[in-house]
A protein has these predicted regions:
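Loop-to-helix entry region of an early transmembrane alpha helix in multi-pass inner-membrane enzymes
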Residues: 74, 78-85, 90-134, 167, ...
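Membrane-proximal stem/loop segments at transmembrane-domain junctions that anchor or position
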Residues: 274-370
């Protein structure tokens, strides 16, 4: 009993240490204007909720919500804007900063007079990230039944997050999606290891909440059902009735979470859907990458290696060789895709009615380019964690091989959803690692296991040598 209390206390201290490291890394970043990057997407919706009680499409509305009530929208999921609203209720200074930023975006005030203040969100981000790290560590410990792996995985996950501290200092969704996914993946591991209806229900609730944070996670619903079936039928040899009941329990819990949002969208917007225009906009921007030339295709593989790839390629081939991969350059794939999207919106008003025709035309003319280009995009998106990624990615590969050889299928099931999302982002989005931070979980867990096994083997050899010498 005393050992358990001590272990719990040590883990609490570890959690506080992780939080202290992450919150410090975020808070020491230079202050950001709240109109920078994609922050206005969510801040405008929060503003509309605060001042009009309307969940809108934010900056994608055609009305100035500082002057008139915006129409209801469903472009973004509701979780993150509501978190911003909660932060504005808790901190009046942040509320004033949000209002000023939105008013400046709509040219109602000068942006120079707005306060670059988002501390409550920064603290919230650090708390979410810490929860995600603990979930990764717990999942690794559960999969490999090793206390050492818990500590190693937690440390590696923290190290992998620090390079993105600047990203987390923006008022955007990355920290929340990372956290919710990591917790959902832990719940999935527990449910697959010891299947029970109650555990599967929790998995469904968490993955449903994830969809309300970022709609692209909708694709994981059938993936998780597939994993439940695969685990039950192939690994546990459970009866089909049991497997079916667990699959239905997941689906029911998932629908309980997203159902109210679907009903709200049907009543307020007139559409039975989770989102509108979101997927169409992303895919239209993704099609711009299909113009990638042969040199860009080949150089993408060394170029995307964190820390070393970009300077080496720029030195050997010049900065213009991969300039289209850098989103802020005028001729980047990002700007070309965004410009095409904006022109379509200007000409037609909406993208969803056009997307089937655009997909048909793209696949008819350049399907082979689309498939080939997805390879470097997935490769580039895979290298999460900055410099740490140079170690985490190969160690993850080793862990996958070891998992097959040593019958650790639970690790492969744990990794599968994040790998599916990597492929999805390469197919319908872009190559930026910010969308694939959920890979840190399986990467850190796998790397921790490999390191622990190497250390254990070295310790055994050392003891054997000492025994033989004596």
């Amino acid at each position: 009993m005393r050992d358990r209390v001590f272990d719990f206390g040590v883990r609490i201290v570890f959690a506080l240490g992780v939080f202290a490291i992450l919150v410090t890394a975020i808070l020491i970043r230079p202050p950001k204007w709240l109109s920078d990057f994609d922050q206005s997407f969510y801040l405008t919706i929060a503003y509309d909720l605060n001042h009009h009680g309307v969940f809108s499409n934010g900056v994608f509305d055609k009305v100035n919500s500082t002057a008139t009530v915006p129409p209801p929208g469903m472009f973004f999921g509701p979780v993150y804007p509501w978190l911003i609203v909660a932060a504005t209720k808790a901190d009046a200074r942040f509320a004033q900063a949000v209002d000023c930023s939105v008013q400046a975006t709509n040219n109602q005030v000068e942006s120079a007079g707005c306060d670059a203040y988002a501390r409550p969100m920064h603290i919230m981000h650090a708390a979410f990230l810490t929860l995600g790290v603990l979930a990764i560590a717990a999942a690794a410990e559960t999969i490999f039944t090793s206390g050492a792996v818990f500590w190693l995985a937690g440390i590696l996950a923290t190290l992998a997050l620090i390079p993105d501290a600047d990203l987390f200092s923006f008022v955007m969704t990355e920290s929340v999606t990372f956290s919710l996914y990591s917790v959902a993946a832990l719940a999935l591991v527990l449910a697959l290891r010891t299947p029970r209806i109650s555990r599967v229900l929790i998995v469904g609730l968490l993955f449903g909440l994830l969809c309300l944070t970022r709609p692209s996670f909708l694709v994981l619903a059938p993936v998780v059902v597939g994993l439940i079936v695969l685990n039950g039928v192939w690994l546990l040899r459970a009866r089909w009735r049991t497997v079916l009941s667990h699959s239905l329990a997941f689906a029911l819990a998932w629908l309980i979470i997203i159902g109210p949002w679907l009903v709200r969208n049907a009543v307020s917007v007139g559409k039975w859907a989770l989102t509108e225009e979101y997927g169409s906009a992303a895919l239209i921007e993704r099609f711009a990458f299909d113009d990638m030339n042969a040199q860009e295709f080949v150089l993408a593989f060394p170029y995307c290696l964190p820390g070393i790839g970009e300077p080496v390629v720029n030195w050997a081939f010049g900065q213009q060789a991969m300039a289209r991969f850098v989103y802020y350059t005028p001729e980047s794939f990002f700007h070309i895709g965004r410009s095409h999207r904006d022109k379509l919106v200007e000409a037609h008003g909406r993208l969803d009615p056009l997307i089937k025709g655009l997909i048909r035309d793209e696949m008819a003319e350049r399907w082979w380019r689309y498939l080939l280009v997805s390879l470097p995009l997935a490769w580039c998106g895979m290298w999460v964690g900055g410099w740490a990624g140079l170690a985490l990615v190969p160690l993850f590969g080793c862990a996958c091989v070891m998992a097959v050889r040593r019958s650790k299928p639970l690790f492969l099931l744990y990794a599968a959803p994040s790998v599916v999302m990597l492929g999805l982002h390469a197919a319908v989005a872009n190559h930026y690692t910010r969308y694939n931070l959920i890979l840190i979980g399986p990467f850190a867990a796998g790397a921790a296991w490999v390191v622990a096994e190497i250390a254990s083997a070295a310790s055994r050899r050392r003891r054997a040598a000492q025994n033989s010498g004596s």
